Structure formats: C-alpha cells, structure tokens
Amino acid sequence: MQIKIKSIRNFLFRNKIYGYLITKNDEYFKQPDNLNLDILRKLTDFTGSFGIAMITQDQNYLFVDGRYTTQAQKESGRKFKIIKIDLLKKFIDNRFKKNKNIAYDDRFFQLNFINRFYKGKSNFVPHPFSLPNLKNSNKTEVFEFDKKYHGLNFDKKFKKIKNLIKLNNDEALLISSSENICWLSNLRSKNVYNPIIKSKAILKKNQLFIYCNIKNIKKSSRINKKIRLLDENKIFSDIKYFKK
C-alpha cells in the first residue's frame, strides 16, 4: 500500500477526530483517469469501480457495492473490514457514539451525500487531509470538436445562454459539471481514457473562463478567443471577486 494507514491514523489522533472518509472520486466527482491516480486503490488495494474507505482510530473499513464484496475481500480483506456500501449510514449511526467526529475532504464528496449524515449521532466535519496530490503528469492536447459532431458552435450556444440568463457586467454563472463545460465550449482532450476535460468554469457576460489542470494541457490554436483556460486553483480567488 503506497499510502500509509498509519499516517492517516496519526492525523486522527492529532486532530481529535475519530474517523476519516476517503472516496474514489477526485475533486471533479469523477473516477481517476488511470490506476496510477486512484487514491482509494493505493490505500486499500481495491481495484473495483466504486468504494468508500473509513479509517478510524482503531479499525479500517471498506464499503463497496454488493457486486464487489468477494473481490474486495480478496484484495483488501487482510487489513479492511468489508461492508456493503448501502449499509454505510446505518453502520455509522449504530456503531459510533454521539459526538464522535467523522471527517471528510469536502472537495471529493457531493453535498447530497454528506447531508444524509448530518442528522445522525456522529458529527460530520469537513477537514482536508494531505493525501498525495495525484495528478496526471502527461500533457494532453485540448482541441475544438469538429463542427460536424457538435451541432452548434460555441458562439451560438453562448448567445443562447446569455439571452436566457441575462448576466449583468458584475454577475457570473458558475458551472461545476465538466460534461456541461465541454458541451458549451465544444472542447475535448486527447486523453485516451476519457476526452472530457475535468474542469469548472465561470461564465461572464462576454467570456467563458475554464479552470483546469493547465500545466498538463497543450492548447490548440483553434480555440475560440472568447474562451480562456486558467489554472484550476485560481477559481477560488476569482469566485470571491463576485461575492457581495
């Protein structure tokens, strides 16, 4: 296991946290592009397509879909107790006493998932832990999708959205879905695993800003001039600019 359970457990004791949730998703709520970027796999050795690990101060649990219990037991059962993922909430409510903190990194969990637990006995708290920053180091080209496949070009889609939303100069629309961003911009990557560009975007009155892992992107000269590709970490400071 390339990620040490001991380091997570030390983090729990230092911060007086009882348990920590780790999912297979990345910050775009997508599965990793390849196995080398899979944090859950590096922690548990589990190679299935979905799962959630919980490391507590004294136990390790791996919650998986019922289809994967045999596989998970074989791959991870030596160090993890395997439980069906649909029992996760019941397990937490029944197992842990009131006021025990369960932490998670809110970059990797959707709000509707976490909201299921806030009325339970345990306290769910967002608390990032410095897991390895596993990023794809291979550069990939971003290009404009051929017009025979996209139906409408970016300018026409952009105009339709502006007519529908009618943004003022000091307003913007945050887009969190990578698929929606790629549809609007007609951009794709040459990633062999998935052509969708993992990204978030801010749509302003006259421009679309796409925030992605810019260091690993080779930009095509054909990209529309109203589209700007920016570093993914810059989105936080840019969002603050629009706060009133």
Residue spans for each PLM region:
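N-terminal accessory/capping or targeting/presequence segment of soluble
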Residues: M1-R95, F109, F113-F242
